[in-house]
Regions:
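Metallocofactor- and cofactor-centric catalytic cores in central/energy metabolism, strongly enriched
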Residues: 2-132, 137
Length: 139
């Protein structure tokens, strides 16, 4: 099959933080997906995650993604070669990856994890305050 004709099967396991936890196990059990996708983020969620990180720097991600959703399907995902895509890392994607790696190690499951970073603007705020630019320059 050429790349042009390749079919990619994507299963949407969640649409928001707090969505039902039954989707991921059902999709994985079906064996009919190549990618399992979790969407956790919305403006309110980001605010909650930022508050959690302020209290405990290792937090700031959707903990249930690791402790509930992935723990339930991790072995099967690996066995079936399903790739997982998620934005559950919130304001601490590396913390989410570290927590997931710890669960994988605990379960004895080999796991490769990629992390996308670069959109955290909080470190820029002190410099912006010092520069005191007019609002129109920040747009």
């Amino acid at each position: 099959m050429t790349a042009k004709n390749k079919t990619v099967r994507i299963g949407g396991a969640s649409g928001f933080w707090g969505d039902s936890s039954v989707g991921a196990p059902q999709l994985v059990a079906s064996g009919q997906i190549d990618y399992l996708v979790f969407d956790y983020l919305a403006e309110l969620t980001m605010s909650i995650l930022a508050g959690a990180r302020l209290k405990k720097p290792e937090l700031g991600y959707a903990t249930d993604f690791v402790t509930v959703a992935m723990r339930a399907v991790l072995r099967d995902v690996i066995d079936k070669g399903i790739r997982v895509v998620s934005n559950a890392g919130g304001v601490n994607p590396q913390g989410c990856a570290d927590a997931l790696a710890a669960v994988a190690a605990e379960l004895g499951v080999p796991l490769r994890i990629a992390v996308v970073t670069g959109d955290d603007v909080l470190p820029l705020i002190p410099g912006l305050r010092e520069a005191d630019p007019p609002v129109r320059q920040l747009q």
